[in-house]
Amino acid sequence: MGETAAGIYGVSTKIPNLISTISTIFFQAWNMSAIEENDSKDRSRFYHRVFDTYQSFMFIASAGLIVFVRILSNILIDSNTYPEYATAFLYTPVLIVGVLMMCFNQFLSSVYSATQHTTHSFWTSLVAAIVNIVLNIILIHIWGIMGAAIATFASYFVCYCIRIVDARKYVPFPVNHAKFAANTAALFLLGIVVVEAPPMWILILAVGFVFMVLYNFNAITQTLGQLRRRK
């Protein structure tokens, strides 16, 4: 990629970084709780509840950012001064899902920290880095900036697939893979609608966001209720 393309890619990461900020706040509190719960009898149930809630909340937040990506881009990106950055929003939805996968990986790394298997964080991250480099070399020549965005998502997704299997060897807890797949697919569909802007696209986005909230809200409310009773 040239300097302009690299600049567009850099600008398009501004909104996805908001997801990372939200996750960091949660992760700081969660990491301590994970260590405290490591020796408890119900730690598997605890991990299941928190991870399910965390995923649900992050999927809703990601959907919200994708739905409002055009508005947020106009606020955060000065396309009047730098008109070449006006197209940055086209790549943002893929990067949002990529950063979301990174956040899930960060959560799973807490399992390694709590169970003292931190080397697994290293080698799974190494695999992701290798995938990212290889895919960037291949996809940038084919799709340019979008290729780089897809490579970012794919590398974090590969890391997630490895960690969701490996980390649960040390703390077995159930994961709803079908729900994860449905949520991820829904985010990509919302992203396609934002980019392509088909007829009635605003209505489609509104319906899609409501679906994401309703599909995930129950997990959040149930866990919050259980945590209150636990206290």
Regions flagged by a language model, labelled:
Residues 13, 24-28, 90-116, 120-140, ...:
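Short runs within selected transmembrane alpha-helices of multi-pass transporters and secretion channels
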Residues 1-18, 29, 33-36, 70-83:
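Helix-terminus/linker motif at the lipid-water interface of multi-pass membrane proteins
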Residues 62-67, 133-137, 187-201:
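Hydrophobic alpha-helical transmembrane segments in multi-pass integral membrane proteins
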Residues 5-23, 52-56, 98, 133:
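Alpha-helical transmembrane segments of polytopic membrane transporters and translocases
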Residues 66-100:
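Interfacial segments at transmembrane-helix termini and the short loops linking adjacent helices
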